[in-house]
Amino acid sequence: MENKTETTVRRRRRIILFPVPFQGHINPILQLANVLYSKGFSITIFHTNFNKPKTSNYPHFTFRFILDNDPQDERISNLPTHGPLAGMRIPIINEHGADELRRELELLMLASEEDEEVSCLITDALWYFAQSVADSLNLRRLVLMTSSLFNFHAHVSLPQFDELGYLDPDDKTRLEEQASGFPMLKVKDIKSAYSNWQILKEILGKMIKQTKASSGVIWNSFKELEESELETVIREIPAPSFLIPLPKHLTASSSSLLDHDRTVFQWLDQQPPSSVLYVSFGSTSEVDEKDFLEIARGLVDSKQSFLWVVRPGFVKGSTWVEPLPDGFLGERGRIVKWVPQQEVLAHGAIGAFWTHSGWNSTLESVCEGVPMIFSDFGLDQPLNARYMSDVLKVGVYLENGWERGEIANAIRRVMVDEEGEYIRQNARVLKQKADVSLMKGGSSYESLESLVSYISSL
C-alpha cells in the first residue's frame, strides 16, 4: 500500500506540461499528465487556444491558454486551422513566444502555495524555445518525445544523410539503395521523411540541440520495442531517458479533438474474432479522389470485413465520402468519421490495422497485439513503417502508393494467408513483451518509478 505521508509530499509538487497543439502530440502528453497525476503530482497544462482539448474531461488539471490569445497578432490569427500550413504555428511560436511563456511561468511559480513547489516543465520536443526560458527561471525542463527512438537516431544522422546526397530532391537514381549506416532503410524512405529538408533543417537542428540540453527525455516507447536504438540515445543525450509506453497506461479517447462514433462497438460485437480490418489514416492526412477510390476498391477486393475511418476533409475536394459509388459498402464494411481508436484496437473482432504509420497509432497497435498494414504520408511515417515491417516484422509496408491489387494482397496476407502467420505471431509476442514490461521489475515499470523519483528530487 502506498505511504500516505509520501503521497502528501508528492501532492505538494506541481508539474507544468506544454503540448504542441496537434492530435498526435496532444494525446501522449495528456496521457503522461494523467500518469503523473496518479503518482501524486499536481498538474497544470499550458496550451494554445487553437485545438484546445475539452477541459471538462480533465477536472483534476488546471489549464492556462497562452500564446495565441491576441486576435490582432496576424502571425497566428491568419494561419489556416487545417492542412500543412496549420503547422506553421510551431516555428512562429518558437520564434516569438519566449517572453509570454516566461511571464506565464513566473506568474505560476510566484502564485504557488507555500507548501507547493513547481518541480519542472515538461514540453513536447518541438517546443525547443522553452529550454532557454526554463533556464532563465532556474526551472528544470524535461522533454516528451512523441516519435520513436529510431526516428531520433535518423534525426541525428541528418548531416551524414546530407553529405551522402540522400536529401537531394532531384537525385532519383538511388531510391531503392540501402542507406549507409541504416541497412533497414532505403534511400527513398529518407527522401520521403525529409522531403521538406530546407524547412525542417533549422527546426530539427534546434530541437535536437535543446533536447540534449534538457534535464531528461521521456519516450513514448518501451525498451523491448527499440532496444537496438538505446545505445544511440544514451550516447547523444547526456540527461536520463525514461521509456514509458503511454497507451498501456491510459486510452487517449478523452483527448480527441473530434467526436467519436461509439455505435461501431455494437457492429464489432457481431463480428467473428480477428475478422475485421480497422482502417484509419490519422487526424491530418489527405488523399486525392483517385487514390481514395483505389483504397476503396482494394478493401472490397480483399474480401475481408472492414471498419474504415474517413475523417471529414480526408478526401481533397470532398466533404466526406461523396466519391464512393452507391452500394459500395455491401455487408462487409462500415465507414465512420472518427472512433476511439485504442478501444477499437482492443476489441476482439479486430484482426489487423491499416495505418498511416504515425507513432501513436503504431504503438497503440503494438500494445494490443494487432498486426499492421503500413502506408505513409511523409515525416516520421516512412521510417516507422520500415522499422516495424522490416525489422520487427509485425506488418506489411505498402511502399509504392495506392494500387488496389497490392492493397488487397497485403490485407489478405496480414489477416488470413498462411504466409502471414509469422506476422500475426510477432505482433502477439510484442504485446506480451509490452505487458511484461509493465509488471513490477519490468523495464517500463522501473522506468516510470525512476521518472517519479527523478522529478521528486528536482
Swiss-Prot record:
Binding site for rubusoside: 25
Residues the entry annotates as binding rebaudioside A: 25, 146-147, 155, 359, 380-381
Result for mutant: residue 151 to A: Reduces catalytic efficiency 16-fold for stevioside
Catalytic reactions on record: steviolbioside + UDP-alpha-D-glucose = rebaudioside B + UDP + H(+); stevioside + UDP-alpha-D-glucose = rebaudioside A + UDP + H(+); rebaudioside E + UDP-alpha-D-glucose = rebaudioside D + UDP + H(+); rebaudioside D + UDP-alpha-D-glucose = rebaudioside M + UDP + H(+)
Thermal dependence of function as given in the entry: Optimum temperature is 40 degrees Celsius with stevioside as substrate (at pH 7.0).
InterPro entries tied to this protein: UDP_glucos_trans (IPR002213)
Reported impact of residue 25 to A/N: Abolishes catalytic activity
Family in the record: Belongs to the UDP-glycosyltransferase family.
Subunit: Monomer.
Protein name, as recorded: UDP-glycosyltransferase 76G1
